[in-house]
């Protein structure tokens, strides 16, 4: 009996040791599934950071977005994910254009923008109705449309990119800054263009300083403005600072008090951004936003200067898919004809 009891004790001890050994292995060994993930993470393709680029595709000017996307895709090896934002009626068209052209290889998502979010926030202004189009305000709502990224690039559709978009994405944002823009006074080479077409590059050109609400901001009217057609944004800071809510507040105040209008320099989308981001933004390399190409059908930059530029922006009335306009050859290099034939370039011989 004593022998049997001793055998049972030994068996119990062995059982306890076996259980301990199993538990030790489970705690300290890397599971096979995790090992596989580790191998995958070490592969260059998986390590490559995704670069989200937001661009709008508006009815009547969808070819602009296509040319912009084409130029970005052709000039980089980076892992770019395009978020193409449009209204519900335009989404099928942009899908077909991309899927039936050489852009079918790009990574993209088509995102619907609901214009109802703007109800009661836009003051109607007949002087430049194109500036009141809903997609002009997509940049205000970036965190609501693009949710899985920490850093996002937003681009107007009337641009082409001649550099590697990775460089723009690598723009450093200072702590506490939700966005980076290009200052309107940052590049001496553009000053002559600005003077020749009578453009404003200060807050005076965008805000109505006759209004008390504007004067109460304490911003000097001679403060250099910035252009929000190219944005590198930090989504965490944007949400933390409630940037979208701040922009909406100034939109609603403009409806009530007419603090700015499209008769001023940048219309109704730039002005609230100038207010909200005053003194609280980082800067983009000036060569990554050469603008004003659309302000005059006659005034031109030098060919050498344009070749050095990383990004060209036809902000203004004179767009490169229309006539008259300048430097259209640089834009048309990246244009891909519409497979459906709906979008056509306007040229003097057409």
Model-assigned labels for residue ranges:
Residues 2-350:
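Glycosyltransferase catalytic domains, chiefly GT-A lineage
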């Amino acid at each position: 009996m004593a022998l049997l009891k001793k055998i049972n004790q030994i068996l119990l001890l062995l059982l306890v040791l076996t259980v301990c050994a199993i538990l030790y292995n489970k705690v300290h060994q890397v599971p096979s599934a995790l090992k596989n993930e580790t191998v995958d993470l070490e592969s260059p393709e998986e390590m490559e950071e995704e670069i989200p680029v937001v661009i709008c595709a508006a009815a009547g000017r969808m070819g602009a977005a296509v040319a912009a996307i084409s130029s970005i895709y052709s000039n980089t090896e980076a892992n770019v994910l395009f978020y193409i934002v449009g209204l519900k009626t335009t989404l099928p068209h942009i899908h077909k254009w991309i899927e039936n052209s050489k852009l079918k290889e790009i990574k993209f998502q088509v995102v619907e923008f609901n214009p109802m979010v703007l109800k009661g926030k836009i003051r109607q202004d007949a002087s430049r109705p194109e500036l009141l189009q809903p997609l002009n305000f997509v940049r205000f709502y970036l965190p609501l449309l693009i949710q899985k990224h920490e850093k996002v690039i937003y681009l107007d559709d009337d641009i082409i990119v001649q550099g590697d978009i990775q460089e723009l994405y690598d723009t450093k944002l200072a702590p506490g800054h939700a966005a980076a823009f290009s200052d309107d006074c940052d590049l001496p080479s553009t000053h002559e263009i600005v003077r020749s077409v009578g453009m404003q590059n200060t807050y005076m050109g965008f805000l109505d300083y006759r209004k008390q609400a504007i004067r109460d901001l304490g911003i000097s009217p001679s403060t250099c403005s910035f252009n929000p057609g190219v944005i590198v944004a930090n989504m965490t800071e944007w949400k933390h600072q409630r940037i979208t809510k701040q922009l909406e507040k100034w939109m609603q105040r403009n409806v009530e008090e007419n603090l700015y209008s499209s008769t001023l320099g940048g219309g109704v989308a730039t002005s609230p951004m100038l207010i909200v981001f005053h003194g609280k933004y980082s800067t983009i390399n000036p060569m990554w936003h050469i603008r004003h190409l659309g302000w005059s059908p006659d005034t031109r930059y030098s060919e050498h200067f344009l070749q050095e530029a990383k990004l060209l922006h036809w902000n203004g009335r004179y767009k490169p898919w229309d006539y008259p306009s300048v430097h259209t050859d640089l834009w048309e290099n990246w244009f891909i004809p519409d497979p459906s034939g709906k979008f056509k370039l306007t040229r003097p011989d057409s």
